[in-house]
Amino acid sequence: MKKQNLLQVTCTVAFGVAALAAESVRAQGSDELLRFSRYNFGIATARSAGMGGAYTSLGADGATMSINPAGISMYGHSEVGISPGLRITSQRADYSGSGGNVSNRLGNTKGNIGSFSMVYANGNFAVGFGMNRLADFNGRSRAIGYGEQFSIGDMFVEQLYGIPASNIGAPENDIYQAFFRYPPKLWGGILGYQAGLFDPVAGTGGPDQPSQQYTTQGMIQPGTLLYPELYRRTSGTVNEYTISGGYNFKDILYVGATLGIQDIYYNRFDTYSEATTVTNVGLHSLFYDQNLRMSGAGVNLKVGATVRPVPWLRIGVAYHSPTWINMSEEYDGAMTVFYTQPIAGYDYGFSDTPISRDEYNMRTPSRLLAGISATIGSVGIVSLDYERVWYQDMKYTSDGFQDINEGTTATPGIRELYGPTDMVRAGVEFQPVRSLFLRAGYGYSTSPYRGSEFRRYGEYQQWSGGIGFRNHRVNIDLAYVYGTTREMPFKPYSDTGSDGYPVTTDGTIYPRDKNHNLILSVAFKF
């Protein structure tokens, strides 16, 4: 079992899973808070997506209610629009460990409704209601290693040090008593003990006392090579429902505001497994399943203004307040351990947990957007956006999260892990003939992680293109968006040792995501 230095501690905390033995958010740290705070470029409408999302200074599109609400006052007519889409994700997971490197890739395809909008325009004033999908969590990944020397059971042994064996058994009259006695952080270890992955060390609890130390050597002989695998399936979205209003001052100054109400859900199913080639004694294989279900609602405010100093130029600015979120979660797990030879007449051991429920509040960072666009005669538009997001201001606002928010002597807090990001978006629209529009866009976001050694993780790039047909009654737009990012590496399992520093495996998983979005928008004017 490896003890890490402070740099590796930062990696383990920031790199995602933190501990497969403790998947509740209170045990994980700040990675889920980042997940619900980072939208990248969203999905939105086909017109805005085709232009790379560079829409801070533009308007008269359903996406403006979630970008710069001043754009709603640019509508010259009332409109109803919907944007269904198809999202294809490809997730690559490279496993690097003592046995070498292995690459694996899985894909996922899912249809969706990216946005919906209704706008009523009356002269200089417009109001609207809409829905924009800000984030999509649907995906699958698999990471496979080989020749590892450490087992997740070794982490569990360290995790349960000092806990009497009599407290973590499963008596027939109350099989879940151990789980109600200890927090979910220890549930993985309890599952391992009850399924027979490791044994108590006799005599470690004092005279006539139950053992308080454990060992895997009865199941995993020294020198045994392990073949770990982590399969992950995620689903969920962040949808934002918007109520917007805007006013147009003589086509020179446009102002607007949006009340955003977010609907959030996220599900994650993990199966971590280990297998050996041993046939005569001990462990044959283990399977550790975990389910995390999260749902919540949040509220925020957006305000914006756009000025048109000359007919061909627009300059826009918008501020997005933090989103205040109330989140609920459920977590449960199960473990099955298969033996090479029957133990007490059984070929395998099994244990599962009850459902752990928790509720807490969180705050996402604020955002500042600025954009400039120019009309090129009657044939085109060029638009450029800049966005700043202060991820160091993310925070859990409920009790019990002080160590995550502020850090400890062994683990860094949110302000040490995260910093501000800079995002640029650029888009062009060209009208070669009447009613036909061609579009292209690009976007780039810097990493939210602090430290030069981490900056290559979390960067996001996006390329897009689109085509549109528009007349006085209907708009039909189609866009294709391709995005790619390298996520923070993480350990397949990790926990804090008795000295306060993480104890973990040799293996590290390096995820890379690619996604393809096809968006069709149809809007009717009246």
Give the location of each predicted region.
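Low-complexity, polar-biased intrinsically disordered regions enriched in Pro/Ser/Thr/Gly
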Residues: 3, 94-105, 494-507
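Outer-membrane beta-barrel porins/channels
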Residues: 28-42, 48-49, 121-526
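Outer-membrane beta-barrel translocator/receptor signature
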Residues: 46, 58-67, 72-150, 239
